[in-house]
Amino acid sequence: ENFAGGCTPGYQRTADGRCKATF
């Protein structure tokens, strides 16, 4: 599922708009 930012599940959107792994 896509949330704000369109990151893959398990990833969080950072302040600069990129996707970072949360694990």
Swiss-Prot record:
GO terms for molecular function: cytokine activity. GO terms for cellular component: extracellular space. InterPro entries: GBP_PSP (IPR003463). Disulfide bonds join 7-19. It comes from the Eukaryota. The keyword Disulfide bond applies. Hemolymph. Keywords: Cytokine, Disulfide bond. It holds the Pfam family GBP_PSP. The keyword Disulfide bond applies. Causes rapid, rigid paralysis when injected into Lepidopteran larvae. The physiological role may be to reduce hemolymph loss following injury and promote wound healing. Belongs to the GBP/PSP1/paralytic peptide family. This is Paralytic peptide 1.
